[in-house]
Regions:
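N-terminal alpha/beta PP-like core and its mobile active-site loop of ThDP/TPP-dependent enzymes
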Residues: 2-228
């Protein structure tokens, strides 16, 4: 099995095992290993693929899904200037603490600053807008994706895929996969998240769940702060 296929399957398997249900992919050449791996997972109904040709549109589409569900949504694109189109949505995700998992395909690092086609400085292109960044050049074992960092905002994984990009192995790499489905909470019901911990913070502000004023008032009458 070639390096790009191994790396893509390792990443996709972890994403599926984490309970991620949707991925938004913009077609391209360099991200072909990821696209094929996600397609294999979708054929087993392990994940749903949404295809958007324009990267800016794709990023905001994923942002909306992540915002509505509270679950991480990966966005996948090819190398080069395509990556820059993600920036507006990444900034929105950063300011709103939305779990957007940005995975950008890249050419090998040795082709940077050489004038190679579809190659630009993708490493740390989003600056401080992301909670975590990694420039991945090959599969490492054990390899663990930073899902904890997604709890506070977007994460960027820049993945270097050397040629060949096509899959050269038909092994059943999804066999025995164990999916950890996150506990579901109804974001529209008052008090839904209160059961997650014994102590917490009630956040009232811009678009924090869509509760009406009456719902907030009935959240729990025993809290004096809500009765003042």
């Amino acid at each position: 099995m070639n390096q790009s296929t191994t790396l893509a399957r390792t990443i996709v398997r972890q994403i599926v095992e984490a309970g991620v249900t949707d991925v938004v992919i913009s077609p391209g050449s360099r991200n072909a290993p990821l696209t094929m791996a996600f397609y294999a997972a979708s054929e087993r109904n392990l994940i749903t693929i949404h295809t958007r040709i324009d990267e800016r549109t794709a990023a905001f589409f994923a942002l909306g899904m992540a915002k509505a569900s509270g679950r991480p949504v990966p966005i996948i694109c090819t190398s080069g200037t395509a990556v820059a189109n993600y920036l507006p949505a990444v900034l929105e995700a950063s300011h709103s603490n939305i779990p957007l998992l940005v995975i950008t395909a890249d050419r090998p690092a040795e082709l940077r600053r050489t004038g190679a086609n579809q190659t630009t400085e993708q490493a740390r292109i989003f600056g401080k807008a992301v909670r975590y960044f990694a420039d991945i050049s090959g599969p490492a074992y054990p390899m663990e994706l930073p899902f904890n960092s997604l709890q506070s905002g977007p994460v960027h994984l820049n993945v270097q895929f050397p040629e060949p990009l096509g899959a050269d192995d038909e092994s059943d790499w999804l066999a025995g996969i164990t999916i950890k489905r996150p506990k579901e909470f109804d974001r529209k019901l008052p008090g839904t998240f209160y059961t997650k911990s014994t102590r917490g913070v009630l956040v009232i502000g811009h678009d924090r769940g869509g509760l009406a004023v009456d719902d907030v008032a009935t959240f729990n009458p025993s809290y004096s702060i809500l009765n003042q």
